[in-house]
């Protein structure tokens, strides 16, 4: 049984249909990449899984349980957390207060405040600062740490590298490797094809709200990926 399964998933913003019959599975312990151009439906898929966008109850299952009709906080309690695009930290709160918010769902596990600070030492040094005082890379670390504080079985990461310098992106993805080593299952949305394939075991390429290509990440023909990415 897959940890996450989407069957015929459709998603709408009002009358606009953003996803068309998405079939996607994530096995326990995998790292899945979702790639595609802007507007392909990648973020919409993550929002549907995380409960931020309503969809049919039977269209998404987590560990065999339908979750499409659940609220976002119910889904977090089941073990799904999301690192949203743009970080979405609370600017009036300190770094540590932002992190502690992630633990309010009450799930037990390896990820504690001390463990997050071990993963991101610079957050420990800046724990008393307001989130707005952090650099973009540090804010991304705080957003990841906040999600980890809920001790998720499945971590959804939306555009981790967006707007960050290459050296910062490298450090962020090195930390993602440490999270994977802890046994966390990941779904990573990323526009950088090379980075997405290097970080994942399998990938799905979205194009205009549909799955255009799905395959193992290692050794797949890059020309075929590029064609699916741009709809050529």
Please describe what each predicted stretch is:
Residues 2-232:
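Glycine-rich phosphate-binding loops of nucleotide-dependent enzymes
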């Amino acid at each position: 049984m897959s940890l996450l399964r989407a069957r015929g998933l459709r998603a709408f913003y009002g009358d606009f249909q953003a996803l068309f019959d998405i079939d996607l599975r994530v096995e326990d312990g995998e790292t899945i990449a979702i790639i595609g151009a802007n507007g392909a439906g990648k973020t919409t898929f993550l929002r549907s899984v995380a409960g931020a966008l309503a969809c049919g109850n039977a269209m998404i299952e987590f560990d065999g349980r339908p979750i499409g009709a659940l609220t976002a906080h119910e889904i977090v309690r089941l073990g799904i957390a999301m690192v949203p695009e743009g970080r979405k930290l609370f600017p009036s709160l300190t770094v540590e207060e932002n992190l502690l918010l992630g633990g309010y769902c009450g799930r037990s596990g390896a990820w504690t405040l001390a463990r997050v600070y071990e993963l991101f030492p610079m957050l420990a040094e800046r724990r008393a600062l307001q989130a707005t005082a952090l650099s973009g890379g540090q804010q991304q670390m705080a957003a990841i740490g906040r999600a980890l504080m809920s001790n998720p079985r499945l971590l959804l990461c939306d555009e981790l590298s967006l707007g960050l310098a290459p050296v910062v992106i490298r450090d962020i993805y090195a930390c993602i490797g440490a999270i994977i080593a802890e046994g966390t299952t990941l779904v990573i949305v990323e526009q950088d094809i090379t980075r997405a394939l290097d970080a994942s075991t399998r990938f799905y390429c979205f194009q205009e709200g549909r799955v255009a290509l799905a395959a193992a990440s290692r050794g797949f023909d890059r020309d075929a990926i590029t064609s699916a990415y741009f709809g050529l």
